Amino acid sequence: MTLAILGISCLAAVLSHTILFIRGEWDKHAPVLFHCFITCPIALICSLLAVGLYGITFMFIQVWLCYISSICLSIIIYRLFLHPLRDFPGKVSARLSTLRWMKTAAVDRKWHLEVQNMHSVYGDFVRIRPREISVNNFNAIRDLAKCARGPFYDVNYPHKSLQMTRDRNFHLRRKKIWQKAFSPNAMLAHEGHVRQCCQELMGYLSSRGGQPVEVTELMQRVTFESMGWLVFGKAFNMIQKGLSHPGFTQLRSVKQLGGLLLWAPWTLILLRNLPFLRSKATSWLQWCSQEVVERKQNPTMTHDLFSHLLDDESKDTDDLVYDSELAVVAGSDSTASTLTAILFLLATHPDKQAILQKEVDDMNIGGLPMPTSTLVNMPYLNSCINEALRLYPAVMSGSQRETGPGGVILDGQFIPEHMLVSMPTYTIHRDKRNFVRPDEFIPERWTSQSHLTLNPDAFIPFSVGVYGCLGKPFAMMEMRMVISSIMSRFNLRLLPGRPMSHEASAPAYDCYIIHIPAFSLVFEPRAGNIWA
């Protein structure tokens, strides 16, 4: 009798896998599956033990473990020998489960380096997860950009934002609204707020009197302040006054969960839906929600992002919360990391710093901060920014896409239908087939030494296609203004004893959005320079 029951359990496991679980997507249903396979069985076992039904309890445990082990065995056999991606190269453990990458992605946050290493071993097309192929081939960029988004973008399920949605119609409708916030006229209004942030930054750096300054947090404060104006139309007073802010604290805390997003996006869906695990995952969203409610209750004449989002007749409060999260995270965190990288690269390359300072001095006729109309015509400044974006793109692991019915051909390689494909930006940007001396900081590759850029189309820091970054104009304006302001007034110096190597002294962590650990620089006032 016992063997018969266990046999039925095994059969049920195999049938549920082959008929149900290999069809469709289950990531967004992670909480339901967790309760069905973990919470409920454990609760039942505890209940049976409480009433003294030990025999039934033992039998249930056997059946439960038999089902779990059988479905795991079925999954292993399918993924190794029957899966549509079985012929693609890659590590055997990666074909079986994403558990292979838990430490690399979620703990060490070095997923970008692991992917780069796999491509160096296995080639342009590598199976990095049971259902996902990583493609390091610039010829495939445009074709891949046409594909739909993958389940990675269900992480906010059941809610949506401009970025975290797979609903193309929702995205297109939301995109039109966001575009208004980054139109040329809107950018002129935003420029004044960024200028004010730069002035506060210059005042703060001057007050330090040449003492070491922790750069990573300072740049995060600057960009968070500018996002306060852009998104909510108000100041957070975090630069000159050095005030702390709950939203800023929550953002820094929640960023540590970015590794989970890269390892297995469904883990964040699970965290947000399990009462005993949700506190850290939701505290950041609670702050965003409070800001949204406050902004809705206090209409202003400011043409911030929310002035456009609130005009949307189909607006949903929860979706507004996730749009605000997107704006603050994408607008402040990613830009702050790029600014941090630029400053360190300039500090470790004094010759490049001197060239940039000369360009700034030559163009700085009307005082600081210079207007955008001047900054966009400064080739070396823009080259330094582009080179930092190449070496340290904001999203190093790239974007996930899903092949449609019939599959897709990428540079001659067929990818079966309904498979996931990602294009690792960090790896592409550091591929010697695309850029000569790819690991070196050479701003001239974008100007006088263009021969060092073999494939300009391989430069994709803001992504491409319909899902490209809408905030690029604002990010570029802010980076140009901050860097030019600093270069006009200060020399950047490393602390004594600091190695002259960016990668060795300030390694980049892949938290979905790049993170550069804390380090300090000396902002030494330039002799004879008067800041207007």
Swiss-Prot record:
It holds the Pfam family p450. SUPFAM superfamilies: Cytochrome P450 (SSF48264). Signal peptide: none annotated. Its cofactor is heme. InterPro entries: Cyt_P450, Cyt_P450_E_grp-IV, Cyt_P450_sf, Cytochrome_P450_monoxygenase. It is an enzyme of class 1 (oxidoreductase). Its main location: membrane. The lineage of its organism: Eukaryota, Fungi, Dikarya, Ascomycota, Pezizomycotina. Heme binds at C469. Belongs to the cytochrome P450 family. Its EC number is 1.-.-.-. It comes from the Eukaryota. GO terms for molecular function: heme binding; iron ion binding; monooxygenase activity; oxidoreductase activity, acting on paired donors, with incorporation or reduction of molecular oxygen. It is a multi-pass membrane protein. Keywords: Heme, Iron, Membrane, Metal-binding, Monooxygenase, Oxidoreductase, Transmembrane, Transmembrane helix. GO terms for cellular component: membrane. Cytochrome P450 monooxygenase; part of the gene cluster that mediates the biosynthesis of the indole diterpenes nodulisporic acids (NA). Nodulisporic acid A (NAA) and its chemically modified derivatives are of particular significance because of their highly potent insecticidal activity against blood-feeding arthropods and lack of observable adverse effects on mammals, in particular the tremogenicity associated with the paspaline-derived IDTs is not observed. It is found in: Membrane. Pathway: Secondary metabolite biosynthesis. This is Cytochrome P450 monooxygenase nodW. The chain crosses the membrane at residues 2-21, 31-53, 60-82. The keyword tRNA processing does not apply.
